[in-house]
Amino acid sequence: MEITSVNHICFSVSDLNTSIQFYKDILQGDLLVSGRTTAYLTIGHTWIALNQEKNIPRNEISHSYTHVAFSIDEEDFQKWIQWLKENQVNILKGRPRDIKDKKSIYFTDLDG
């Protein structure tokens, strides 16, 4: 008996339509299905679920290392930084990295 993979990652969002646009247009996800309060997209081979929840606190955790990491081709690293900046994505400072680590871009979605 084993867990074979992660089926999907679900994000709570305050506005489903603007979040769909962010994940489609900025992160280049493919929209699979969209309902009244839920949408599913794929980014690479990962399913991303967006679940609209308007009345929940969103700024309670401001210094957590909890995150999702996407993989990109190394040669596209600077292109992605430029793309995120051009689209006014909130790019975070990140954390100190060991020189042996791969490069990372830390950013938030529309809900932080």
What residues fall within each predicted segment?
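N-terminal beta-strand motif that seeds the catalytic metal site of vicinal oxygen chelate
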Residues: 1-17, 68
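Short, conserved charged micro-motifs
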Residues: 18-19, 75-80
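Helix-adjacent hinge/juxtasegments
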Residues: 57-66, 71
